[in-house]
Amino acid sequence: MTLKPNNAPRLRYQLIAATFGRIVINTAQRMIYPFLNAISRGLGVPPETIRQLLSLRGAFGMMAPLFGPIVDRVGRRNAMLLGLIVLCAGLSLVAIAPSLISVFIAMMLIIACKFLFEPALQTYLSEHTPYSQRGLVIGLTEFGWSGAVLLGVPLAAYLIDRGDWLTPFLPLAGLGLLAGLWIGFVIPADPSQTAHAKANSLARWLSVIRNPNVIAALTVSLLISAANESLNVVYGEWLEVGFNLSVVQLGLTTTVIGVSELLGEGGVAALSDRLGKRQALMLGLALSTASYFVLPFVSGQLEWALAGIFAVYLTFEFAIVANLPLVSELMPEARNTVLSTAIAFHAAGRMIGAALGGWLFSLGFVWNGVAAGLMTALGIPLILWVVRERK
């Protein structure tokens, strides 16, 4: 079901506020990767310990469907606000009581925030925009992912350089509070006693996991997430050790990733509705597969390595974002449940990738590229032969 679309000016303000909120959330999630070594040094543990925490975070991510009923019960806007409260609590905990345990708890709370915030936002937008414009609208909100790398991570690098690994946590909590106030002002609360709040959440979830069309599309998300995470958990160490980069330089190299992701998201916004969601996803998978295979062989010099990373993250982002509008309409009668389950599959992929990434890196960086390419390529036959786009 798609409700009456928002008027354009109102939707524009809502998109800006929601994107700001996503930049804050995703900065908290993503700053761990380039500064993994700095954080591990600050905690006095080896980098592999942080990678293990990331893998556990992915395992926790598979609990995302349990949060779907909360979104239905409290409403879309209130779920977003609740998610931001959870985020601020996790960030503040690390700032006040830094330890390996508090970092782990914060990781879990940041993911819990995403369980609440992102399905609520995507469901709200899907209910207020027609499918013919869904790729554009969801593609625009995904600027909150690249914006974290373009704006948030360089800011975190600056703060770490001026202070220590703890310095970014409290400012991020303050920005999370600001995002909550902004979203509460521009996005209205759901009407009371909505139909989706009364629906049987267990029955909806069972109908989702029994739908081969949905499961195939979500499996594609799992595969490409696993591929990307197997690179995420090692690229900071690869660049720092291989090219002798400082923390600030590592923060600046993430700008390359941010620009590539921004272009990938813009590509989905521009092309997904024109090409068709399924065709756009197949294009992204094919290009992403090729870029992973090529990356290890262009890493002899920093300039070529950054060019390879640019291609990898551009094509990955195009593929992962192209899947979102497609998934949002596979079962519109259970949209929030589908989107919550999508986060679980995405998190499962992250868990697999985090577990594999360090081990592959110990064998040689070339195996990170080969494994990521193979995992991404497995998604192509699923889209070709199983997934059918709902018109």
Residue ranges and their predicted role:
Residues 64-75, 264-276, 361:
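Helix-to-loop junctions at the C-terminal end of transmembrane segments
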Residues 33, 215-255:
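Extracytoplasmic gate region of multi-pass secondary transporters
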Residues 63-98:
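Conserved MFS/SLC helix-loop-helix module at the cytosolic interface between two early adjacent transmembrane helices
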Residues 2-9, 189-217:
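Juxtamembrane intracellular "pre-TM" segments in multi-pass secondary transporters
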Residues 107-144:
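Cytoplasmic helix-loop-helix junction between adjacent transmembrane helices
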Residues 55-68, 255-264:
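Central cavity-lining transmembrane alpha-helices of secondary-active solute carriers
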Residues 141-185:
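Helix-loop-helix hairpin linking two adjacent transmembrane segments in secondary transporters
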Residues 278-323:
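C-terminal transmembrane helical hairpin of 12-TM major facilitator-type secondary transporters
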